[in-house]
Amino acid sequence: MKKLLSLILTAIMLVSCTLCYAEETPPAKPDGEMVQGTPPEMPIGEMPEGMGTPPEKPDGEMGNGMGMPPEKPDGEMPGNMPGGMPGGMQGVPTEYDSVYTVTEDTEFSGELESTGKDENLIHVTSGTAQISDAVITRESADSTGGDTSSFYGVGAAVLANGGTAVIENSTISTDAAGGAGVFAYGDGIAYVSDTTITTEQNTAGGIHVAGGGTLYAKNLNVTTNGESAAAIRSDRGSGTMVVDGGVYTSNGVGSPAVYVTADISIHDADLNATGSEALCMEGLNTVRLFDCDLSGAMQDLDQNDNTWTVIVYQSMSGDSEIGKGHFEMTGGTLESTNGGLFYTTNTESEFILNNVSITVCEDSEYFLRVTGNANQRGWGSTGNNGADCTFTGIAQLMEGDVQWDSISALDMYIADGSHLVGAVINDESCAGNGGDGYCSLYIDEDSSWTVTGDSWMTNLSCEGIITDVDGKSVTIANADGTVIVQGESEYTITVDNYSETCDMTNAGNVSAWENYAVEF
């Protein structure tokens, strides 16, 4: 009897263990199915359906494609995820709606109108569209704008994405979201001359390239009034723009006069932003300004840790390839009505200024800022998002402080009769735990620095003159207080290394407009 009871108890225990195991360990599900609320691993670049926005990743990276792309400066819309589809997962359109689709040489003139949702008035896929003495109107209250307009030209008045558009002596007006004036994409080429372009709504640039498109402009009058609607605009996939003469005005918030994710050369043009920074560049791209008048009026926004006039940065949105952004300005004027002047963060960058007349606001925060950032839109991770910058002034007056931090690298060349008036300040407010960055200042024999406050830098090489505003010599010392050069001024320049000789080998050189000008 005892033996029988023992067998029964053993059987009961085995059944109980089996049930417990079944409750704690559910059976494996087929690949891709959800298991008791625990999602399977997703391929890189995909987002599980129904999931919210996870925390941002450090160093500007997206969390395996699961985060939302950071926004662009001063109100620009978010761009694409790196290497993938545009924000919203929209791909290249397989077809476009248009009033006129051009597949062979065609001429247009007179009044031309488009009122459809997200449609182009003229879409050139092959051949040449010759548009002369035309009055073009594009209006639609239903158009959506957004990424497909910014990246591919959906809804633009004139789109060339396979053929050539030649526009002259015409007027283009759009009042539709995403209603760019003229857009060149891919193999498309646009020539636009002696034409007035006005756009009213968001993501409606004046002249626009993306995806490798090419656009040449001469003597245009362009005005944009929406947000994220630069008068001269480029976006994902880069491209080439050459602009000669004209007036370009952007009136919207987040609408610089020039938005650069392409190779852009501009000559003898008025470039005005009334509610935004003057110029914004992202990633491995280039802008050259020759004898232009550039102005900006950026607003102070809570999401930004400072206010600027020209920015070179990397948002990690995927709108531009990561690499060195190149800003070059020869002659002309630069005016800032609010904030600092030049700002670079979370990227490599090069600035070259050659004899530009600069006007800054009375309370300008800086001439040049090369630091990390704590921007709320996620341009890298604070403490790991500094800049690597080379700045060259040629025959250039530069008034204002130079700010740098230890997670950045700055080589600043003051050359050929240039004059810096300001202090060099080590600002660690966005540097986290700091790093091994540096600031090196090079002053050639024809140049000078007027020091307006105590200054700190890693390396100072000077063959020129350093004084304060009263003409007094300035003390140069090591961090431990060891005096290298005894001065009479109240100010001290603190350095790790000091040299009375300058190596200007890596200073920037200016380009010539003639190398980029196109006659048409």
Task: Kindly label every feature range from the protein language model.
Residues 125-201, 208-217, 221:
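Post-signal-peptide, soluble extracytosolic/periplasmic N-terminal scaffold domains
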Residues 102-110, 128-134, 165-170, 189-195, ...:
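All-beta strand scaffolds that present successive hydrophobic residues in beta-strands
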Residues 81, 85, 271-272, 282-287, ...:
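Intrinsically disordered, low-complexity terminal regions
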